[in-house]
Design a protein with these regions (language model features):
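Condensing-enzyme catalytic core mediating Claisen C-C bond formation in acyl metabolism
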Residues: 1-51, 154-218, 297, 308-310
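Acidic-glycine-rich active-site phosphate/pyrophosphate-binding loop
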Residues: 30-33, 90-103, 140-147, 182, ...
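Short beta-strand segments
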Residues: 81, 113, 140-146, 171, ...
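Conserved beta-ketoacyl condensing-enzyme motif
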Residues: 51-115, 225-243, 249
Length: 310
């Protein structure tokens, strides 16, 4: 009997030009000590996309539609999640105009904000709620993206290195490769006023680990499983330290944490989890019934999304 749970399919992504971290020196963003620090944390490259954000998105959307065999007219809802420091009315209008140029017409269009780089899980959660509704759309298009707008890809204290990128997928009640079992998120508003500096790192870490554990426990309970049932963890590629922390908080064996894309791409704004799923399944598919978990962490937000291979 086919499961009634909403399913994810046709994940496509774009990361622009992949450049070695040494290029940051010529760009005036880093010195040699910073390069060595990034390398020690497992980061070798970063991604730079000179296109406007809406062009980054439409290239992914075109790939998702082609792979799924769907047309814009088949999409009943669009869920947009951005992980950008600057997103304004001009950007919003450019994105909507780009959708119209692709053939999208009157439909439900939602934007997910205040989730930072955990936005993909929130967007998947909203999309699954939409298509699960008795009067909801048959197919929802999810598009996640982020792009450097500040001229500095380094997080404070060089804790991570940000890359440009976009990723899209279809969420529908019909066919798909991964079904969405559950989702959860937590935001700690008390951290918003804290400066991201070394003296405050312990506060961020304590709160972050606590929130990560809670959201993982929540989705395990929703799926009536335990951490032992997880075949893979797809996490925020902040650094090797991020991956170790997220893996520990999820309760999953360290070897199950997907790490291959950290050296390849660094931290692609908001997109790491879905990009990892795509690449891992192309390289080595999961067995039917196996569970995977998408776990994301930003300084004051933690989220998790539990999925199962169809």
């Amino acid at each position: 009997v086919e499961s009634a749970l909403p399913k994810v399919s046709s994940i496509c992504y774009s990361v622009g030009e992949i450049r070695p971290i040494e290029a940051l020196v010529a760009l005036g963003m880093a010195d040699q000590n910073t390069i060595e620090s990034l390398a020690a944390r497992g980061i070798q490259n970063f991604c730079e996309d000179c296109r406007p954000a809406h062009d980054m998105c439409t290239s992914c959307i075109a790939g998702t539609l082609a792979e799924s065999g769907l047309q814009p007219a088949d999409i009943g809802a669009v869920v947009l999640g951005h992980s950008m420091a600057k997103w304004d009315l001009k950007e919003e209008q450019a994105f909507l105009s780009a959708l119209a140029a692709m053939g999208f017409s009157r439909s439900q269009i939602f934007g997910v904000s205040m989730q930072a780089c955990t936005v993909a899980n929130a967007a998947l959660d909203l999309a699954r709620l939409l298509v699960s509704s008795t009067s909801g759309p048959k197919n929802a298009l999810v598009i996640i993206f982020g792009k450097d707008s500040e001229g500095n890809r380094l997080a404070p204290q060089a804790a991570t290195l940000f890359s440009d990128g976009a990723v899209s997928c279809i969420v529908s009640p019909g066919s798909g490769t991964l079904e969405i079992v559950g989702a959860a998120s937590l935001t700690d508003p008390a951290l918003a006023a804290l400066e991201w500096s070394e003296p405050n790192f312990p506060k961020y870490l304590v709160s972050g680990v606590m929130s990560l554990r809670k959201v993982c426990e929540s989705v395990y309970a929703q799926g009536r499983i335990s951490a032992r049932d997880i075949a893979a963890v797809f996490a925020t590629n902040g650094s090797s330290i991020y991956l170790q922390m997220i893996g520990s908080a999820s309760g999953v064996a360290d070897k199950q944490v997907y790490r291959e894309n950290l050296p390849r791409y660094a931290h692609v704004y908001g997109c790491d989890n879905l990009i990892g799923m795509r690449d891992r399944m192309l390289a080595q598919d999961f067995k039917s019934g196996e569970y995977v978990i998408s776990v994301a962490w930003a300084p004051n937000v933690a989220s998790a999304c539990l999925l199962r291979r169809v």
